[in-house]
Amino acid sequence: MGPVMLDVEGYELDNEEREILKHPLVGGLILFTRNFHDAEQLNELVRQIRDASHERLVIAVDQEGGRVQRFRDGFTRLPAAQSYAALNERYQASRLAQEAGWLMASEMIAMDIDISFAPVLDLGHDCIAIGERSFHECPEIAMDMAESFIKGMRSAGMKSTGKHFPGHGAVRADSHKETPRDERSLNDIRQRDMAIFKDFIQRQLLDAIMPAHVIYSQIDERPASGSPYWLKSILREQLGFQGVIFSDDLSMEGAAIMGSYAQRAQRSLDAGCDMLLVCNNRKGAVSVLDNLSFVKAERISALYHHRGRYTLSELQASDRWKKANQMLTQLQEQWQERA
């Protein structure tokens, strides 16, 4: 399987996209809001993607909840991560987070989608790019909520992706628009932001990790997503992480410091990423495919969903889905009223 995850433009594949998906470097595809009209159309698009590729691709989406939820009509409107602990006592918050993880994963698997890039493990709500996507500013509470969410995902048959290593929450800047700089010491980052990653790796709660397009300037002048120090020395060697490392989208401005699209891809791969996201720029994606040295992404196949297929309507007829949908819809409405 190839190490590149691409996107497509619309509701169905065009001929160019069918050819691109056959490229040996392509190993995954991520879906966005622009790819979604309704559940029936989405189901057909996923079928087209499966049929177009010579190998089984990992199909992904960002279906976190709150403001980052690509598919809405016909699916449960998931609450923002911050809402669980903000509006509930600890036990109930954990219970709701677990049901949200299960429901989100179950709905995506019903569409034959392998993974949602979740959960967000960043701490605090001040960063423009993170905000309500963070479970809490307190590491212990964030760990409790995130662990419950992961347990729910796994019970549905979906693997987890913790993001954004080693922590994006302490910078205000948005890495979609610029390259943020975190001026803290390595010890400060270890004691706070990295603690949740370390704990979850030790307890084997993370199947994949996505590093941040953030420069931690006291440690390395390269973004973590393109830093061998962060990905090989810290994540692989010191923390012992054996799962998949995804780059964040290489079209983000936070990655531009690494050079052209082909250079960003090669540097991220050399730094230790297993799969590279190249989205929202077809020319850049083609440049990556034309220039990247072929590397087989051995770890990626571990992320395929592993539950028997059921339709979305069959899932929505189940008692557990009905109860979870009711609780989470109520929480989402309460959170919107508060906002």
UniProtKB/Swiss-Prot annotation:
Marked site positions, Important for catalytic activity: 174
Chain positions covered by the region annotation Disordered: 164-185
Enzyme class, broadest EC rank: hydrolase
InterPro entries reported in the protein's UniProt record: Beta_hexosaminidase_bac, Glyco_hydro_3_AS, Glyco_hydro_3_N, Glyco_hydro_3_N_sf, Glycoside_hydrolase_SF, NagZ_Beta-hexosaminidase
Chain coiled-coil ranges: none
Cited SUPFAM superfamilies: (Trans)glycosidases (SSF51445)
Primary location class: cytoplasm
Gene3D superfamilies the UniProt entry points to: Glycoside hydrolase, family 3, N-terminal domain
Compositional bias annotation for Basic and acidic residues: 171-185
Record-level GO BP terms: carbohydrate metabolic process; cell division; cell wall organization; peptidoglycan biosynthetic process; peptidoglycan turnover; regulation of cell shape
UniProt KW keywords: Cell cycle, Cell division, Cell shape, Cell wall biogenesis/degradation, Cytoplasm, Glycosidase, Hydrolase, Peptidoglycan synthesis
Annotated Gene Ontology cellular component terms: cytoplasm
Keyword Cytoplasm in annotation: yes
Gene Ontology terms, MF aspect: beta-N-acetylhexosaminidase activity
PROSITE patterns tied to this protein: GLYCOSYL_HYDROL_F3 (PS00775)
Domain of life: Bacteria
Compartment(s) of residence: Cytoplasm
EC number: 3.2.1.52
UniProt: substrate binding residues: 62, 70, 133, 163-164
Catalytic activity: Hydrolysis of terminal non-reducing N-acetyl-D-hexosamine residues in N-acetyl-beta-D-hexosaminides
Pathway info: Cell wall biogenesis; peptidoglycan recycling
Active site: 176 (proton donor/acceptor), 248 (nucleophile)
Function: Plays a role in peptidoglycan recycling by cleaving the terminal beta-1,4-linked N-acetylglucosamine (GlcNAc) from peptide-linked peptidoglycan fragments, giving rise to free GlcNAc, anhydro-N-acetylmuramic acid and anhydro-N-acetylmuramic acid-linked peptides.
Family: Belongs to the glycosyl hydrolase 3 family. NagZ subfamily.
Protein name (database record): Beta-hexosaminidase
Provenance organism: Proteus mirabilis (strain HI4320)
